[in-house]
UniProtKB/Swiss-Prot annotation:
Pfam families: LDcluster4 (PF18306)
One GO cellular component term noted in the UniProt record for this chain: cytosol
Name under which the protein is recorded: Uncharacterized protein AF_1126
Species for this entry: Archaeoglobus fulgidus (strain ATCC 49558 / DSM 4304 / JCM 9628 / NBRC 100126 / VC-16)
Amino acid sequence: MKLMQIGVIGAGECDEETYRIAYRVGELIAEKGHVLINGGLGGVMEASAKGAKSKGGLVVAILPRKKDLCNDFADIRIATDMGHARNVIIVHSSDALISVGGGYGTISEIAIALKEGKRVASLKPPVVIEGMRVFETPEEAVNYCISSSVK
């Protein structure tokens, strides 16, 4: 099995249900031995990173500003000082992406990923865009991403 870098994208603030879903996505990515990449802030990013760490996973945070803004669950912190432009780095660093909820930033990441031909699985999508796949469970979303070929 080839190691994958799976991006988990979503809003920096979220409700409890979205947090639980993102946490489970992080757990599953780690359990399957893959690397989780995200934006390093709160909400979906924190939840997915925390879930991955609970299962011994590796988390890479691509931060919009400085390293000290990162949540406590990233192993590798990449400070870009690029604001939302860092979304492009998250997408290009990921072999496949899973969106959990989200807003405009998440929509931009989904669009860039689809433009680049990457698989995008979505749970509670902010919008549905042609080419992305919507799933009901974290297990389905993670399995879909893992079944993709590494680019």
